[in-house]
Design a protein with these regions (language model features):
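Extended, low-complexity, charged alpha-helical tracts
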Residues: 49-50
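Catalytic zinc-binding patch centered on the HExxH motif and its immediate surroundings
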Residues: 39
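Long terminal segments
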Residues: 1-21, 26-28, 36, 44, ...
Length: 110
């Protein structure tokens, strides 16, 4: 599965391959493109989904852990996103912590 290019602009708008997928607000709330609250990303890296509770954590070193599946991937400094099972799955431009949280919510919600 290739996620394509995911971008988060300075206002927090999240796009994938040019299509608006949601927004990350300054308080860490993640809203879908129709403004429905789908989750929250805390400053400590914990990620919570409205539907499923805590879905994971993004560590400072870029490791992505899912509460359901354990260590699922890595965010590299160059923005490359790797899945342990599938290899390179995408490219990210922007804040890695934010997109890490969004990606876990993305797998869970979209």
């Amino acid at each position: 599965m290739t996620l394509g290019i995911i971008e988060v602009d300075k206002k927090g708008a999240i796009t994938r391959n040019g299509l608006l997928r949601g927004v990350i607000e300054k308080n860490g709330k993640v809203l879908s493109s129709d403004k429905e609250l789908i989750g929250i990303i805390h400053d400590n890296g914990n990620i919570f989904s409205v539907k499923n509770g805590m879905t994971g954590i993004v560590q400072e070193n870029g490791n992505i852990f899912s509460t359901k599946y354990g260590h699922i991937g890595q965010l590299k400094e160059n923005g490359t996103i790797y899945s342990i099972k599938k290899g390179q799955v995408g490219l990210y431009k922007g804040n890695l912590r934010k997109v890490g949280g969004f990606l876990l919510l993305f797998f869970d919600q979209f």
